[in-house]
């Protein structure tokens, strides 16, 4: 595998309908890309996902490798993929998504020419038919090596779809993604960033992110059932954030990232109180005041319209044993929920 440069890890659970499209997008006019290693991690799937993946492995053994394992959720697939990856760089591709073949080739060319810790690329949001709805880019010079401080303004809008890491950096910090829960992709764009000293942005679309599919973890019904998973992830991010020195150049990125994510979680909870069990949020919020006072204070400054909604929620719920859910049912007070 000496000519290979990039390992793509594909966590896969019951994706028989879309896995073929995903794997096809990694081929060049139907032929294997010799610079790629593709690890398809079958996470205890009960449909034909494994059969489909093994079919590609049989046809293109030089790039596709299938790993069947018991179900352990998303993070366990990332951990397995990282352990097995043999190439200099690593990228995650979800089985219901795909890549832009032209953009992928440009990314590979850049990986072969530059030596850096992180490569950021554009990604597009697509509907289930594959039509591009929008494209996400970064307001920073392309084809230029930047230092880690330049990540600061990008923190609030970072997504796992945009990142490609140097593999050895993640192993050096013994990176381990939380297993058994959803939404751990947030961890992938947090602690690994502490290993970045230089990065390059390539304003080419590589990743095609499918939205609007029934059963996605970002579906509001799925999120309502699993919001405690988000809180577990946020607690993990808080531990990393608290350990980083404020003078570190990466601190600004982590601050922007965790503040945006925390605001998103609190907003979803407090504007969907009829669907949510608030007990986990109350426990987390009480712990947060001592775990990370700066984040606790920041959340208290958030406004919806003219209402400091988190501050009021804390005041009414904690001190009067009385919720203020009615404040959050009026659309004029709804905040701008960040994606």
Predicted regions and their residues:
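Glycine-rich, basic loop-to-helix element that forms the pyrophosphate-binding segment
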Residues: 69-85
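Donor-binding/catalytic cores of nucleotide-activated saccharide
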Residues: 74, 78, 95-200, 209-224
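Short beta-strand/loop segment that forms part of the nucleotide-sugar
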Residues: 35-45, 65-70, 95
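Short aromatic/hydrophobic "clamp" motif used to bind/position activated sugar donors
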Residues: 90
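A conserved acidic beta->alpha catalytic loop
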Residues: 25, 42-51
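Acidic helix N-cap motif at the loop->helix transition within catalytic regions
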Residues: 20, 47-56, 68, 98, ...
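Membrane-interface aromatic/basic loop that binds lipid-linked glycans or pyrophosphate carriers
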Residues: 271-339
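Short, acidic, metal-binding catalytic loop of nucleotide-sugar glycosyltransferases
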Residues: 24-35
């Amino acid at each position: 595998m000496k000519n290979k440069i990039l390992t793509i890890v594909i966590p896969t659970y019951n994706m028989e309908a879309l896995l073929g499209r995903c794997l096809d997008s990694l081929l060049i006019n139907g032929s294997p890309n010799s610079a790629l290693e593709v690890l398809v991690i079958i996470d205890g799937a009960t449909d034909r996902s494994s059969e489909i993946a093994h079919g590609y492995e049989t046809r293109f053994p030089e790039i596709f490798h299938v790993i069947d394992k018991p179900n352990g959720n998303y993070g366990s697939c990332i951990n397995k993929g990282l352990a097995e990856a043999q190439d200099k760089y690593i990228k995650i591709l979800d089985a219901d998504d795909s890549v832009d073949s032209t953009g992928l080739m440009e990314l590979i060319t850049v990986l072969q020419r530059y030596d850096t810790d992180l490569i950021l690329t554009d990604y597009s949001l697509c509907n289930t038919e594959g039509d591009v709805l929008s494209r996400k880019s970064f307001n920073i010079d392309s084809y230029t090596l930047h230092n880690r401080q330049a990540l600061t303004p990008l923190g609030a809008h970072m997504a796992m779809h945009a990142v490609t890491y140097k593999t050895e950096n993640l192993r050096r910090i013994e990176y381990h993604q939380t297993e058994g829960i959803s939404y751990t992709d947030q961890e992938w764009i947090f602690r690994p960033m502490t290993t970045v000293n230089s990065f390059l942005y390539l304003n080419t679309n590589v990743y095609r992110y499918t939205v609007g599919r029934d059963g996605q973890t970002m579906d509001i019904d799925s999120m309502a059932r699993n919001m405690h998973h988000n809180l577990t992830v946020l607690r993990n991010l808080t531990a990393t954030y608290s350990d980083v020195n404020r003078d570190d150049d990466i601190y600004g990125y982590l601050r922007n990232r965790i503040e945006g994510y925390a605001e998103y979680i609190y907003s979803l909870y407090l504007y969907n109180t009829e669907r949510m069990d608030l007990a986990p949020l109350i426990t987390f919020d009480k712990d947060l005041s001592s775990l990370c006072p700066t984040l606790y204070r920041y959340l208290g400054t958030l406004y919806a319209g003219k209402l400091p909604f988190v501050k009021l929620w804390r005041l009414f719920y904690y001190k009067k044993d009385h919720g203020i859910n009615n404040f959050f049912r009026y659309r004029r007070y709804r905040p701008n929920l960040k994606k």
